[in-house]
Amino acid sequence: MASNGSFSAQRNANAGTTMKRRNDNRGYGGGIGCYQEERNRYAPPQKRFRSQLQQQFRSGHNPLYHYGSNTNNNVSRVSSQSYNNYGVDVIASNSSFALPNNDSNTNNYQKPFVVYGNPNPQIVPLPLPYRKLDPLDSLPQWVPNSTPNYPVRSSNFVPNTPDFTNVQNPMNHSNMVSVVSQSMHQPIVLSKELTDLLSLLNNEKEKKTSEASNNDSLPVGLSFDNPSSLNVRHESVIKSLYSDMPRQCTSCGVRFKCQEEHSKHMDWHVRKNRSVKTTTRLGQQPKKSRGWLASASLWLCAPTGGGTVEVASFGGGEMQKKNEKDQVQKQHMVPADEDQKNCALCVEPFEEFFSHEADDWMYKDAVYLTKNGRIVHVKCMPEPRPAKDLREPSRVMSVTVPSVAKAILC
């Protein structure tokens, strides 16, 4: 059908007006207009399509659109379905779309108009402008310099190589030289005062580094020329004492590097404590280490060979008596035994106290009756009797016993 058909007058009459769109109730279940109030309240808002621009046709006239469900073999559908409430918009199949910038016959473009009936008209995309490329045959072809395959017998043969000696170098141009010279960093010119200051700072820095290297080379603790150096914190010494020896004994504070040495040291502490407890239980005093420093009398008597001289205490006789009493009390105490809480002779309980020196609970004024026997009080202990000499003959003592008869007579 031609573009100037019978419907052109109706289309032109409605060109400046907006036609009312029908209610779209597809998929709701009711007919057109059913439950319109509920649908407008609960249904989600529908997307409204904006009017699109119609493209130009080769004929130069507006396309003919039909409103209705007309099935014609000479027309092609653009955008619709048979079950919707919209009219079927068709376009004549014999009219073809024209591509812009390719039709040299006409340059007049149609004005945009409102599409009637179809809310989503189909738009034909426009191609991008292009430039016609040259064919491959017109491109330059690179032909390398080929050397002959036959062997060269002449010693004066020179291969066919390009000569670039006569070609001008663009970098040697005067303008290029000026640009390169401007882009290069120019040397910084410093004043004399600033140069002297920088040299002085560099000399001081070098001096400090040399002193630090000399101090590191000397052993720690052997340089006493500068008293302030004794207060310097030596990180190497601290690291060797703490970081290099992380394991420390909780009893004496000795540090070790590995776990094996630490375990051996702890075993030695256990054996020492057991031996001390055994000796105190047997009534023997544990052996104490000698004093760190000798007394003045020992120093005076040592050159003459007089031996050790006991030094009198500063407190006089009272202090000496108190010390002797304390020593006696220390001798008369034994480790506490849960099986023997009462004296074996008087059956009275012992006085128990904790000794910080022995690090154990002890019985006060108590001794062993025998070496491994019962525990008794010191006051309950029988006095020792002198042993008789069996080699001497026993002497018969004469005892005068008054006769019974004489006593009776008197």
Swiss-Prot record:
GO MF annotation, one: mRNA binding
One GO cellular component term: nucleus
GO biological process, one term: mRNA 3'-end processing
Main subcellular location of this protein, as a coarse class: nucleus
ZnF start-end (C2H2-type): 247-269
Pfam families the UniProt entry points to: zf_PCFS4
Parts forming coiled coils: 191-214
Biased composition (Polar residues): 1-17
Subcellular location: Nucleus
Domain of life: Eukaryota
Region listing for Disordered, in residue ranges: 1-32
Disulfide bonds: none
Subunit structure: Forms a complex with cleavage and polyadenylation specificity factor (CPSF) subunits CSTF77, CLPS3, PCFS4 and PCFS1.
Protein name per Swiss-Prot or TrEMBL: Polyadenylation and cleavage factor homolog 5
Origin species: Arabidopsis thaliana (Mouse-ear cress)
